[in-house]
Swiss-Prot record:
DCTP binds at K111, S112, T113, Y114, A115, R116, T135, L136, E137, Q156, Y170, Q180. Pathway: Pyrimidine metabolism; dUMP biosynthesis; dUMP from dCTP (dUTP route): step 1/2. GO terms for molecular function: dCTP deaminase activity; nucleotide binding. It catalyses: dCTP + H2O + H(+) = dUTP + NH4(+). PANTHER family: DCTP DEAMINASE (PTHR42680:SF3). HAMAP family: dCTP_deaminase (MF_00146). One of its GO terms (biological process) is dUTP biosynthetic process. This is dCTP deaminase. Homotrimer. The keyword Nucleus does not apply. Its EC number is 3.5.4.13. Belongs to the dCTP deaminase family. Catalyzes the deamination of dCTP to dUTP.
Amino acid sequence: MSIKSDKWIRRMAQEHGMIEPFVERQVRGSDDSRVISYGVSSYGYDVRCTNHFKVFTNINSAIVDPKNFDAGSFVDVHSDVCIIPPNSFALATTVEYFRIPRNVLTICLGKSTYARCGIIVNVTPLEPEWEGQVTLEFSNTTNLPAKIYANEGVAQMLFLESDEECEVSYKDRAGKYQGQRGVTLPRT
């Protein structure tokens, strides 16, 4: 497997719709308008999250069960800023819609700006031929409230191209998160 460069990412986005909307350079803001960077980087693509968040709450004192998840455990927040309570988490979705090629596996890593504040971004790999908006999980590991900014960089996607195509892709096996849009809760 080899990691793919900015040239490859740009070509795949522009010619094959791999990332939509696509920002072909890294946006950093200006002196009077600082933003957490997003867009193409040397060997990855920095994604943004939308302004729709689902913040976890324990008001129902429910048990967290991935096979029987209670959607009432979340509070919907529509804002350019999301405050995550101490030792809690929130879900969001990428602005970008992805179409992963059959011979590519995509890994998501959190941005160091957030990690240095105790905010961890978790996403499972984007498998070959998966497509959709990515549901992002932000964990606040601190004992203070933490802030996430919508429409700014939150994580980086790395694209790994295999030496050979997989026998069965995510699309072939009709994966349960295929084509997801918006924040998607656990499915079994």
